[in-house]
Structures are given as structure tokens and as C-alpha cells.
Amino acid sequence: MQQLNKISYLNQIQSQQFDVELMSEEVGFTLDQLMELAGQSIANTVVQLNKEGKSYNKILVLCGPGNNGGDGIVSARHLKQFGLQPEIALFREVKNPFFNRLLNQCKYNLIPIHYELQDLEKYDLLIDAILGFSFKPPLREPYDKPIQQLKTTKTPILSVDIPSGWDVEQGNAQDFFTPQYLISLTLPKLGVKSFKGRHFIGGRFIPLKLQEKYNFIVPEYQGSDTILELSNL
């Protein structure tokens, strides 16, 4: 477990610039690679919670239109391969060829895909991958209703990178839902610094040259682990 005050936090501009640099010709990552690594980290977090005694078997992954949603779709495929029962909730038809490839992978893994609101209480765990660090208010259709559902549900929630609707720098400024769990990707965002739930981090791939260039304080993963729990001590 790593202390929260011994790690770098990113604001919105830094988060966006860092993604761009990772996928630059010089650094060489592709969006496919980054989503695969992120999705596996999300799934590994669920596995870790189950190892501790939770019974998160039937899981709904709520996915938005951006990279956060793509991470969620990939996580569903990994969860299925891990023997769990994920389902995906999208809230509009997907026209992006890249996303459709990810969805086809899930269809071939027999993962149910929904395009309408679901009864959240019939699931053991919800994965919130609706909106990411690029979100700017106000909430718009069709994502306003599922995010309101997350505020009232009794089913535990694992948010991806930042809870949907939160400001990447100011946090839950508009009083949206607060999840029980959070998995930050690469480095945590400023807006989750005061998060009180269980906070994990994944995305163990920050190149050493970029760590030095930006003077990042990065997570101290153990052995071959791909996730790490952060402590607020």
C-alpha cells in the first residue's frame, strides 16, 4: 500500500497532454495498447476484491463514448475470461469502428450488451466507465440518467480513473455519486485526492524517460503486480 502524499497527481491539461505524448510517434504506444493495459487493471481490481472475500460475480460495466468507455469494454472481456459474469451497458449505438471492434470481441465472448437503462440492483458490482477526465459540465443525454441512477443505487460501484461527473481538479463539486472503489489509471487526478473509499491504481507502463522528464512520483508496484492500493494515511 502506498501513501497518497507520495505520488504525483495530474490536472486536466496534464492528463490530456500525457495521453497525447504516450501515443506520439516518439514514444510509440497505441490506443489499443493503453486500453488493453487499463482494462486488465480494472479487471484485476475486481479479482483482488473477490480474493479478500467479496462475491462480485454478476457485474454491469456502464460505458460512455470516450476512452473511459473503451477501458470499460476491455475490462468486461477480461472479467469474462476470469470466470465472472460481466454485462455491458451502452446508452446509444456505437458508430466508431474502433469501439465496434472492442464490442465484437465481447460478443464473441458471449457478453450481453444492453442499450438501455438497467435495474442496477440485480448486479453484485457496477463498474462506472461512463465519463473520464475530459468531461466538462453540464451532463447531457443519454448519460445524465445512468449517472443519476448511480447516486441512488445500493449496489457497490467501482469507478474508472475518476467518478463520472466529477471535476478532474475540483472533485465532486456538483454532488454526484461517490463510489465505494476507485481505480486510477497511470497517475491519480487532482479531483480524487480527497476520495475516502478504497483507492487502487493501475496502468503500470509509464516509460522511464517520461518519469524523468516530468519528475513524476510513480506508484511503487510490488513484483509483477499490475495494481496497487493507495493509502490515505
UniProtKB/Swiss-Prot annotation:
Q: State the NCBIfam families in the record.
A: yjeF_nterm
Q: Which reaction does it catalyse?
A: (6R)-NADHX = (6S)-NADHX; (6R)-NADPHX = (6S)-NADPHX
Its biological purpose: Catalyzes the epimerization of the S- and R-forms of NAD(P)HX, a damaged form of NAD(P)H that is a result of enzymatic or heat-dependent hydration. This is a prerequisite for the S-specific NAD(P)H-hydrate dehydratase to allow the repair of both epimers of NAD(P)HX.
Q: Which residues bind (6S)-NADPHX?
A: 67-71, 132-138, 143, 161
Native organism: Paramecium tetraurelia
This entry's comment on the bound cofactor is: Binds 1 potassium ion per subunit.
Family statement: Belongs to the NnrE/AIBP family.
A Pfam family: YjeF_N
Cofactor names:
K(+)
Q: What is this protein called?
A: NAD(P)H-hydrate epimerase
Q: Which GO terms describe its cellular component?
A: mitochondrion
| Domain (YjeF N-terminal): residue spans on this chain | 15-218
